[in-house]
């Protein structure tokens, strides 16, 4: 990050919080999801818990459904105080940090146990530190998000079936390059535009966790649900590192504890429970389930691809692969 920006952000943070401990601090939290989405509910829980822990001294105002902008705009807005907290898919951080490219590398995380071992352990700590050093953003918490699935208007059973298909992806360099490598025409787009783009034929498909596919009613505009489970991208709670550090210690602790407390547990529980029912609900809504052999997809975007295309995070990728999860998974 530009040193002038770092200094300006820190000075602004110090000025903002150089008030009496009893003064109310209002923080604006932005996300792109509808209220019914699991992580939107988790964000509300987080805000409620911060208010309770600080006796109302810190109030978090939630602005969901892209009302403050796209994920990238929300992330960048943290530096200019148009919003203070962003909750969203971690891959968007890759626009500001090389280390954040790790989040959306395809087929890197093996399962939920592996996910928890990675982001709850030393490797997760190293990822957080590198993002802070490179960008000035502080990842306050990692929330579980189910694996990403592909939804399309035509059947996809092998990589060759992706040829010529415009697949909406988040604004993440890793995701764009990975889907292009798989054979698709990756199309970055603000999430709030996806439903209409599918409806109007601007794109041929999209990829997201089941919870978001369901809550966004994509079953109304695409027919095929493809079990690729190609990425376990975390949802992250992000603030400006300097601003968080400048807050009174009790308020800073309340934010960190709340982000890693009930809200995080709620998201994890709901995602894992939902995985058992979301597929059936989507099938009941008219979608056709396709369960392809994942190996041909994995081979196109495996270790050789990562080391060649994303060399700055190859060491982190190897560290993640070496993490052993409980129960030998």
Model-derived segments and spans:
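Generic C-terminal helix-cap and adjacent flexible tail
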Residues: 2, 19, 325-329
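Sec/Tat signal peptide C-region and signal peptidase I cleavage site
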Residues: 16-23
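N-terminal secretory/targeting leader peptides
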Residues: 7, 12, 24-115, 122-329
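Positively charged n-region of N-terminal signal peptides that target proteins for export
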Residues: 1-7
């Amino acid at each position: 990050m530009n040193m002038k920006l770092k200094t300006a952000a820190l000075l602004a943070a110090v000025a903002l919080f150089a008030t009496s401990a009893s003064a109310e601090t209002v923080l604006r939290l932005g996300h792109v999801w509808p209220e019914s989405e699991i992580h939107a509910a988790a964000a509300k829980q987080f805000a409620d818990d911060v208010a309770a822990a600080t006796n109302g001294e810190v109030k978090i105002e939630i602005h969901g459904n892209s009302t403050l902008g796209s994920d990238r705009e929300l992330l960048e807005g943290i530096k200019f105080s148009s919003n203070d907290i962003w909750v969203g898919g971690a891959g968007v951080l890759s626009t500001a940090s090389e280390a954040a490219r790790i989040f959306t590398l395809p087929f890197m995380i093996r399962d939920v146990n592996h996910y928890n071992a990675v982001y709850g352990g030393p490797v997760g700590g190293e990822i957080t530190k590198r993002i802070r050093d490179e960008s000035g953003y502080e990842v306050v918490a990692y929330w579980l998000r189910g694996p990403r699935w592909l939804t399309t208007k035509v059947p996809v059973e092998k990589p060759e079936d992706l040829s010529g298909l415009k697949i909406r992806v988040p604004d993440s360099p890793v995701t764009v390059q990975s889907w292009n490598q798989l054979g698709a025409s990756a199309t970055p787009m603000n999430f709030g535009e996806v439903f209409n783009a599918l409806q109007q034929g601007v794109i041929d498909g999209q990829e997201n966790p089941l919870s978001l596919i369901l809550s966004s009613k994509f079953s109304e505009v695409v027919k095929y649900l493809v079990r690729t489970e190609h990425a376990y991208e975390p949802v992250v709670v992000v603030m400006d590192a300097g601003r968080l550090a400048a807050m009174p210690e009790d308020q800073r602790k309340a934010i960190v504890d709340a982000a890693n407390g009930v809200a995080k547990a709620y998201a994890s529980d709901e995602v894992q429970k939902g995985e058992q029912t979301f597929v059936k609900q989507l099938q009941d809504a008219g979608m056709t389930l396709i369960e392809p052999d994942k190996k041909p997809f994995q081979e196109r975007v495996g270790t050789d691809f990562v080391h060649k295309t994303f060399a700055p995070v190859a060491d982190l990728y190897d560290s993640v692969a070496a993490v052993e999860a409980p129960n030998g998974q």
